[in-house]
Amino acid sequence: MTQIMYNYPAMLDHAGNMSACAGALQGVGIDIAAEQAALQACWGGDTGISYQAWQVQWNQATEEMVRAYHAMANTHQNNTLAMLTRDQAEAAKWGG
């Protein structure tokens, strides 16, 4: 039987990187919204109404994506910590 080895520091680092990426995605979404808000001033009539509806959808989708990515990062971190705690408890039983 082969022993499976986990690199917990690398796994926790990866979870941290995921959180950082979620923050970066949020920043990009804010930048895009700001650019498009500047364009909105030029749009009127049906185009302006369409823009407003589209912007609401865009903002909601961006928020959902960022929330989901944060949730994935938190789940990854929590599961890694749970695995680490369990491994340490098992090792303690064997004197390791």
From Swiss-Prot:
- Entry keywords, A to Z: Secreted
Determine the domain of life of the protein's source.
Answer: Bacteria
Name the major location: secreted
Location relative to the cell? Secreted
Any one annotated GO CC term: extracellular region
Tell me the InterPro entries matching this sequence.
Answer: ESAT-6-like_sf, T7SS_ESAT-6-like
Record keyword Secreted present: yes
Q: Which Pfam families match?
A: WXG100
What family, per the record?
Answer: Belongs to the WXG100 family. ESAT-6 subfamily.
Task: Specify the protein name.
Answer: ESAT-6-like protein EsxR
* Organism lineage string: Bacteria, Bacillati, Actinomycetota, Actinomycetes, Mycobacteriales
